[in-house]
From Swiss-Prot:
<protein>
    <recommendedName>
        <fullName>Coiled-coil domain-containing protein 106</fullName>
    </recommendedName>
</protein>
<keyword id="KW-0175">Coiled coil</keyword>
<dbReference type="GO" id="GO:0005654">
    <property type="term" value="C:nucleoplasm"/>
</dbReference>
<dbReference type="Pfam" id="PF15794">
    <property type="entry name" value="CCDC106"/>
</dbReference>
<dbReference type="InterPro" id="IPR031591">
    <property type="entry name" value="CCDC106"/>
</dbReference>
<dbReference type="GO" id="GO:0005829">
    <property type="term" value="C:cytosol"/>
</dbReference>
<keyword id="KW-0539">Nucleus</keyword>
<comment type="subunit">
    <text>Interacts with p53/TP53.</text>
</comment>
<feature type="compositionally biased region" description="Basic and acidic residues">
    <location>
        <begin position="103"/>
        <end position="121"/>
    </location>
</feature>
<keyword id="KW-0597">Phosphoprotein</keyword>
<comment type="function">
    <text>Promotes the degradation of p53/TP53 protein and inhibits its transactivity.</text>
</comment>
<feature type="modified residue" description="Phosphoserine">
    <location>
        <position position="130"/>
    </location>
</feature>
<feature type="region of interest" description="Disordered">
    <location>
        <begin position="103"/>
        <end position="176"/>
    </location>
</feature>
<feature type="coiled-coil region">
    <location>
        <begin position="63"/>
        <end position="101"/>
    </location>
</feature>
<feature type="compositionally biased region" description="Basic residues">
    <location>
        <begin position="152"/>
        <end position="168"/>
    </location>
</feature>
<feature type="compositionally biased region" description="Low complexity">
    <location>
        <begin position="133"/>
        <end position="146"/>
    </location>
</feature>
<feature type="short sequence motif" description="Bipartite nuclear localization signal">
    <location>
        <begin position="151"/>
        <end position="164"/>
    </location>
</feature>
Amino acid sequence: MNDRSSRRRTMKDDETFEISIPFDEAPHLDPQIFYSLSPSRRNFEEPPEAASSALALMNSVKTQLHMALERNSWLQKRIEDLEEERDFLRCQLDKFISSARMEAEDHCRMKPGPRRMEGDSRGGAGGEASDPESAASSLSGASEEGSASERRRQKQKGGASRRRFGKPKARERQRVKDADGVLCRYKKILGTFQKLKSMSRAFEHHRVDRNTVALTTPIAELLIVAPEKLAEVGEFDPSKERLLEYSRRCFLALDDETLKKVQALKKSKLLLPITYRFKR
C-alpha cells in the first residue's frame, strides 16, 4: 500500500511538473538571428598609403584652382586693357573720318569757282560779240573778276593749309630717352587722367600709346614710391642697355611691400591704374 501510494504521488508530481514546464522555463532563442547593426571600426580604417594619396590629390586640386583663379583675374584685367585700347582706336578713327569729310567739303566748295568764272567769260564774249568795245570791256571785267577769285582761292588754300598743319607742338608725339623723360611723361598723363577720369582720353590727349606707357611704368613707379631702391637698380646708361631692359630691372626691384603701396596709390587714383607687361 505504501508503494502504491508513493507511485501515485510521484505520478501526480510528474504530471504537475510536466504542466508547469512551459511557464517556469525561459524560451530558447537562437543566437544566430541577432546581427550587429553597428559598423566595425576595421572597415573605416584606411591604409596610410590611401590617405596620403587622397591628401596629395586634394592639394593638387587646390593648387589648380588657385592657378585658375589667378589666370581668370589676369584675363579680366587684359580684357579691360583691350577695351580701353579699342575705345582709343575708335576715337582716332572718328577723328580721321571727320577730318577727311571736312577736307572733302572744302575741296567741293572751292571747285565751282573756276567753272562760274568760265561761264561768265563765255556768256560775256558770246552775248556782245557784235560790239568790239563792249566785248573788250567785258573781257577786262572778266579778267579782273578772275584775278580776284584767284586771290580768294589762294587765301582759302593758305588758310586751310595753316589749319591743317598748324598743330601745337605740345600735342606732338615725343620719344623719351631716359628715366627722367619717362617720369615727366608719366606725371603729365597722370595729371590729365585725374582731370578727365579716363585712361584712354588721357593717352589720346598726349598722343601716347597705352602699351608704350605700360612698358615704362615700373621706372616711374619706382622713382615715385621707392626712390631709395634706385641705388640697387643703378642709373640708366643708354650705351649699355635699352630703356625696356632698364624698366624690367626696375620691375624686378619692386618687392611685395612696395607693390602693396603701389596698389593702394592706384586705388586712390594717385597713380595710373595700368597693368604691367612684365612677369616674374
